[in-house]
Structure formats: C-alpha cells, structure tokens
Amino acid sequence: MSRPTRLVIEPSALLHNLSQIKHLAPGKKVIAMVKANAYGCGVREVAPVLDGRIEAFGVACLEEALAIRALGVETPCILFQGVFSSDELSVAVENDFACVLHHAQQLEWLIKTPLPYPIKVWVKVNTGMHRLGFKIHELQKVMGALQTCTWVDKSIGLMTHLACADEPHRPENQQQISLFQEISIPGFRQRSIANSAAIISFPDSQADVVRPGIMLYGVSPFANQNAHDLGLIPVMRFMSAISAIHDNPSFAQVGYGGTWKSDKPSRIGVVAAGYGDGYPRHISEKTPVWVRGREVSIVGRVSMDMLTIDLTEHPDIEIGDEVELWGTHVLVERIAKSAGTVGYELLCQISERVRYK
C-alpha cells in the first residue's frame, strides 16, 4: 500500500485535445509544448502518446529535450529559450534539436562555434511582449549572418509571442499580429505566432505552425471560459482518498487557526493531500472536491499533507473513498479561480511526492 495521492493521466483526453487543435488549425504544423514536465502532466506520460502525431515538441531548455530523447521518442525537439552557453550547441546538433535564437549573444555563439552538422534554428522577434526576441530592424542582419554560416540549416523559422492572447479584446493582439505579418525579409521558410489562446481567438495568426500548450492538456487559456466551453477534456486528474472521518460536537474548530466551525454537530473527512503535494493553500470558502458522484466542500485551512471536507450531509461517504481534487468533474479552472491564480500554475506546482498512475 502507498499514500493514495496521485495523478491519473488520460491519454485519450490528450489525443482528443490534439484533434480539437487540428480541427481549429487545419493543415497547420503543430509544435506541442511539453516544457515544465508537460505542464505538470508528466513528459514520460505525454511524449510517447504524441510521438509521431505532431511536427515537434517545444521545451524550454536542453535538459528537457534530452529527457524526451531518453524515452526513445523520435519526434524533433525545439529549445524555446535556445542555448545558455556555446557548449550546448554541439549537444543540440548531435541530438538534432532545433534552437530558438532570441538575442545577440546566442547568435554570436552560433557563428563562432563550428558544428559537424547543420543546426536547425528559429529566430524570435519581439513584436510587443518585450521579454525575448530581436527587434524587427535587426532581423535583416540576423538573417544575413545565418545564411552565410555553413553550419546553419537554411530552413530558418521566424516566431514571436503574443503578450495578451488570453484577453482577445486587447488591441495589442492585432497590433502584434500585424507587425509580424508585415515582416517581409526573405529567407524565413516557416512562421509561428499562435499559442493556445491565439489558435482559438485569432485564426489569422496561425501562420504555418501553431504552438498549443495549456489547451493540449484540457485547460482553458481564458479566464471567462473553461475546458468544457472549448470542447476540451482535462488530461490530469489529481486524486487522493479519505484517510479519516471524525464526528465533532457543535462549535468544534477544524484545522490550523480554528478558522472553521459549525453551530451543529459535524462530520469531517480528512483527505490525504495538501499544499505539500501542490494543492493551493489559499482557497476561498466552499471550494469543492468530488467524492462519490457529488461535490463536497473543503472546510478549514489546507495544511501541508491534508485537507478537510464537510461530510455532515453525506453519511454514505466512507474512509477509503476516492477524492478528485481537480480533473474531469471539478475543473482546475475552478480551483485556480478560488485560489486567485491560473490553471497553468496549479498544474506545474504538483510536487515530486505525488506519483503518476
């Protein structure tokens, strides 16, 4: 036996969401973003399912790409933050990893580091996010340097990133899209701008390649829509079980600080999951979990290893019953809203002690 706190990853949901993406972006190449351990869903679980069904995996760094290769997955990988030192270039080219170039230092490393094979590159341009990327007026010089470098593959791509795509009404979105579309420098063989939110809201931004992240895992990129609204299915189910049940007298205080009590006798269930597992500590009152086909409210403070739920009106629920913290029935978007954060953060903050099943 082991602690019941676990993640259940649904391959069929992942494939459904990929199908939805391809329906929204017909004929477009797909880079599946699997950085940060596939948004917490587990790259070991996700990458083999998607292998051969997409054009590339998007990762943040060399280490993440090597972890995918170690799984025996053959789909190409793209390092979205590029290399962090010139030494990484030889490892990247030996493993056929493509690199994003987003600043002059990376370009200099590439030009001054002879490589045994041509390396595939994408150039990132800053169209308004002001985080990574060359300025538009620098692109001509960048392209010139790449075209004359004999160890650069000439299938060079151009990409940018939208700062406000999750807020489709913001004028900055169309401004960035227009700036990107107006770039007419020859030599760029493929272009990419659309993340999850843009795939849905800005079909004209899909260009040659789309880059789904959060929607691939069945979570909405928008604050006012959830997965079901978008025809997506949650890939991650964060599960645990009830480890204890106590019958308490009226006005018994529950948990740290005694922040919750009832003016009548109560029945309190203890669930083996807490903020040490990645469940948010700061949630609003009556945030639900799913037990035996219904929602049950969390009461009291979430502690490191446990949380407590009110079973007063649910006498049939027993020790050992499964609890869905978020997933198919209680969408992670609801928990994120309750915690004052976003689904991205909750998926990515699952701790190492939570096992995958």
From Swiss-Prot:
Pfam families linked to this entry: Ala_racemase_C (PF00842), Ala_racemase_N (PF01168)
Keyword Aminoacyl-tRNA synthetase among record annotations: no
The EC number(s) this enzyme carries: 5.1.1.1
Reaction(s) this enzyme catalyzes, per UniProt: L-alanine = D-alanine
Stored InterPro entries: Ala_racemase, Ala_racemase/Decarboxylase_C, Ala_racemase_C, Ala_racemase_N, PLP-binding_barrel
Gene Ontology MF terms: alanine racemase activity; pyridoxal phosphate binding
Entry's Gene Ontology cellular component terms: cytosol
Keywords: Isomerase, Pyridoxal phosphate
Pathway it works in: Amino-acid biosynthesis; D-alanine biosynthesis; D-alanine from L-alanine: step 1/1
Domain of life of the source: Bacteria
Cofactor or coenzyme needed: pyridoxal 5'-phosphate
SMART domains named among the record's database cross-references: Ala_racemase_C (SM01005)
Active site (UniProt): K35, Y256
Gene Ontology terms describing biological process: D-alanine biosynthetic process
Residue numbers carrying N6-(pyridoxal phosphate)lysine: K35
Biological role stated in the UniProt entry: Catalyzes the interconversion of L-alanine and D-alanine. May also act on other amino acids.
Protein family according to the UniProt entry: Belongs to the alanine racemase family.
Alphabetical list of PANTHER family matching this protein: ALANINE RACEMASE (PTHR30511), ALANINE RACEMASE, CATABOLIC-RELATED (PTHR30511:SF0)
Annotated protein name in UniProt: Alanine racemase
Classification lineage: Bacteria, Pseudomonadati, Pseudomonadota, Gammaproteobacteria, Legionellales
Gene name, Swiss-Prot/TrEMBL: alr
